[in-house]
Amino acid sequence: MKILGIIPARYASTRFPGKPLIDILGKSMLQRVYDQAKKSELLTDVIIATDDERIAEHAKSFSAEVAITKAEHPSGTDRSYEAYLKTGKKYDYIINIQGDEPFIDPGQINLLANICDGNTELATLMIKCNSHDVLFDKGEVKITLNKNNEALYFSRMVIPFIKGVDEKEWHKHFNYYRHVGMYAYRADILEKVTQLKPSPLELAESLEQLRWLENGFKIKCAETLHDSHCIDTPEDVEKVLKLMGLKS
């Protein structure tokens, strides 16, 4: 399988402008993500997709291939599709790698790549939800699965409701999973999902992947044991360094 890894990187950010270029222990966040992605032996190529010349020039400084995309896209999926087309090459799958996880585990990328078997249309990662607080956090997206580990639904609410059990104990009575936001797309499916219009469920939950489910596409889910540590604000830098044991 030929698999392309794409790292979207935008300079504009409401909460953290210039985020991809911030310094983290001597390297930019973008370079750290890129270096981690390159450690995955299952990716054929890795490119950075950006709409900003400052990011493009920086990426070239550490010899990364860059695809310049237009500034406005409805979603990261659309940006990934444009970047894929700009390579001028054919790939079987495209994996969208979050550009704000400087210490992403290459094993997570491999885990996703391993289920890209030609039959899988779309794929993503999930991690067990083992606490009441995380389970009921509406910022955490939960996944409901069928017996083939394909997503039935993604929601900010808790699904299923467990009748007759105190909600503080629900996580002890059912295997709940939350979403870890990295996606793999079969190339032909990526083209199709970018043609879809926003759907009612997507608009209600503000979750793009519900558009795919509503239109009959299947999303395979693989369980990871490694949590993701995103940087969304300047304060997150210190938090992530402490979580990774890189700062006391």
Language-model segments: which ranges?
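Hydrophobic/aromatic residues located in beta-strands of well-ordered beta-sheets
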Residues: 5, 46-48, 94, 123, ...
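A residue-level structural signature of the nucleotidyltransferase/glycosyltransferase Rossmann-like core
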Residues: 4, 47, 101, 142, ...
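Short, high-confidence coil segments that cap the C-terminus of an alpha-helix
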Residues: 43, 89-91, 118-121, 217
